[in-house]
Amino acid sequence: MNKKGFTLIEIIVVIALLGAIMLLVVPNITKNFKESKKRLFYDNVLGIYSSASRTYFSQDNASNKSFSNTGVKLDVDISDDITYRVKVDSYGVVLSIYVTDGTYTYKLDNANGISKKDIKLANVIEGKVDDYLTLYEQLFKDNPTISTRTDFSTPFTTNTVNTLYKATENGTDVYYFAGQDTASTPINNWVKFGGFYWRIIRTNADGSIRLLYHGTSTTATDAYIGKSAFNASKDSPKYVGYMYGDTDATLEEARTNTKDSTIKAYIDNWYANNMTSYTKYLSTTAVYCNDREVGSGTYSTTTPFYYAAYTRLDTNKTPTYDCTNNNDKFTVDASAGNGKLTYPIALMTADEIAYAGGVNSTNAPMWYYTNSSFESSTGTTYWWSLSPYFWHGDNARSWDVNGSDNPDNPGSLDYSLVNYSDGVRPAVSLKSCTLYSTGNGTASSPYEVQMDGGC
């Protein structure tokens, strides 16, 4: 029997049939693969959502309310290629969630809270969709190294490039910049906001970011809004107060906060003329601590005593961000403090200066002292802190910072009579919802925030 091979026509028919089968099968395989990958991504989104509340309440004092793969991380097992950002409220309710793996993206915001049933597979977007970071989140992205300090007895001159230092404020984790700004080790805490330059001091317990005024230029040598006495009089211990009472027989009477200090009135007037257009971006719950607790001795109008900041910073070298007495917690919002601030603005504290690297009566040209040219930001002018120092012989004194005319101890903590005219460098706090716009925090490219979104 003769063997017969396939004819050309038969081969063509077979190829056509195979092609038709492939046209039917391959798209389904591809579709199933994409759907499986999309489902896997969606499962990651659900895992991230479910872990947010659990992680929030597992923290000591449920402190952090913002989580991301580059900042404070969630306790969740997810794919390595996932980028996420989640925000919760004080009850652990998710307010916003952003997840992407570069191929798929899920993004949802709801100020009233997001439930699990709101997380729908149908809302997964193919492709990567950019998400705006808050300035708070950008800080962690640009400063991935988180460290802690325990020794505050000497000026802090360690290289701190791209580093944030962790401490606590009333049990909540907060992060601060520390160290000396140099050409080779610049500290990236510059911000341009409201038409002025500022330096980031730290984050606050409410998630806002505290800024120190630096004027209209990064090279300013007059980075203060003017000069003022802390109070016009110095002959009562009550005059260390940012506000004070009508009488001073007891510490409680001295800090009833019925009258504005000279410096508060000065700062409020400057704010009214320069910053009211930007109030919506500033925290009303950030606490500015005018700590009038007694540290050594007993409160008296006739005998000497030292305030608590003296004991902490001069004797024990142990600064704190805590503020123990509600009358000393200056805030706009009474739910977070005394509610006595007219505007969301005050001064940097001596404890914040110590965390930043400063020490009493010791050469300390730290970032808060220098401009971008590494000269004194205030020239020869000393400038006020918010912290009381001591009372002695009809003389009330508060902490301040040396200018360049003290060649032995430039930038160090010092003290002045409260009726002395020092430079005034206000501090404000950008809300946690303030969106990052541009910049990397350097003097040549300061952080800027979006003026049309976030808050």
Q: What residue spans do the PLM features occupy?
A:
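Short, well-structured alpha-helical interface segments that form or flank functional binding sites
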Residues: K3, D43, G47, G195, ...
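N-terminal single-pass transmembrane signal-anchor helix
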Residues: N2-I29
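Long, domain-scale functional regions
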Residues: S63-S96, T100-G102, L108-D109, A122-C455
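Flexible, surface-exposed loop regions and adjacent strand-edge segments
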Residues: N112-G113
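Intrinsically disordered, low-complexity regions of secreted protein precursors
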Residues: K116-K120
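Sec-dependent signal peptide cleavage junction
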Residues: V25-K37, G441-T442, C455
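Membrane-proximal N-terminal amphipathic helix
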Residues: K34-A62
